[in-house]
Amino acid sequence: MLNDSLWNSIHFFLEKYVHLKKNDNVVIFYTPDSRDIAGAVKFALTQLEISCEVCWMKPIKDDFFFDRARKALPVLPDGGGRLVILTFEKDTFSHDRKIYKLLSVYPPERLLIYRAISSCPELFTNALSIAPEEINQFNSTLLNYLMSAKKVHIKTKGGTNLNIELNNEKHSWVSNRGLARVGRTVILPPGEVATYPANVTGIFVADFAFNLNAITDQDTRLQDRPVTLYLDKGIVVEYHSKCKDVIKFLDQCFERLNAKKVGELGFGTNRNVHAPLYMNSHINERKPGVHLGFGQHNQPPGVVGYQCELHLDMIADGGTIWIDDIPKSIDLSSFLAEDVLHTDRFTDEDVFSPELDDISVEDCCGVYSQGEMKLFNIN
């Protein structure tokens, strides 16, 4: 698995995202499905002569993880050095409360936390092979227009034709850039801005992939079997695909309470994501273009007024948007990043729990509940 492309991409991540220093202390937590990735990162850190400990964990439920993790965590010396936490999981996002309880004894300014879901070679060779500063400028440019918008019209080459209403006074935006902030957890892969749309009407054609907060071995690619969804007032009223397996899958998803509601309007901004992956993956969601998340929303509790145990992202390939009455359109795949500062009126606090000791999680999908990811088997 460890070829030149992956090796170089891991080093790029450690340099451009983590900004490693010789006196840093790195601890890697990983689930068995991400053992090879964790091992490759560990090997790179060893070559760089960076102190590193590795601790495995069972996904979701592990009664002995807290004790193992406590033994792996170092005592930071006075006068320098950071604690860098890297977690790698394929389908899950585990043990938030336990991890943050352990980390609460460390000074926030000396703590960096990067949590990767969809861990696989492509996480590094594709999604993390673009500098976070570049993603930051793409996000900044879009948010500069969208956060003052009331209406957005969206079209794609695949046939999407949507009219969307925004309520930026009520609904917050999430911006996943891959940039670390004090007291925040960075979710990887990076590259998305998202909010809750006040209203969505029209036709949406998902012709790239889907992503689900569930364990599934389904082929998530939709390039050769697109899905057409008809939306009225933010709810799916009809959907079609020539692929019977896709329709069966959607039937299983949409039968759940509130699963037909649009809970997220998202725009992917990672231009190193090109072809969709077979696996259920957040990497697909970062594809430049538009996606709609059905079911669970990405807003703080109580803002929207409903909950759903499922979040299904349907992802289109590319897209063009028109904002309010501005004649200039924005091609989501190729727009030029503008020299604007990233807004400070965004959130990475989709789900807040006082048990997390004020360390917040960037969660564009809003699928994390009480520090754990809720999962279902859908096949």
Predicted regions, residues:
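Generic beta-strand/beta-sheet core signal
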Residues: 29-31, 207, 232, 239, ...
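Short linear motifs in exposed loops
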Residues: 165, 240, 331-333
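Dual-mode signal for accessory low-complexity, basic/Gly-rich regions
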Residues: 222-223, 239-302, 351-363
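Structured core elements
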Residues: 163, 203-205, 228-230, 238, ...
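Active-site bordering "gate/hinge" segments
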Residues: 1-224, 325, 336-379
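Internal helix-turn-beta structural module
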Residues: 281-284, 288-363
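Short, isolated positions in well-ordered beta-strands
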Residues: 161-162, 237, 328-330
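Active-site and channel-lining beta-strand-loop segments
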Residues: 225-240, 321
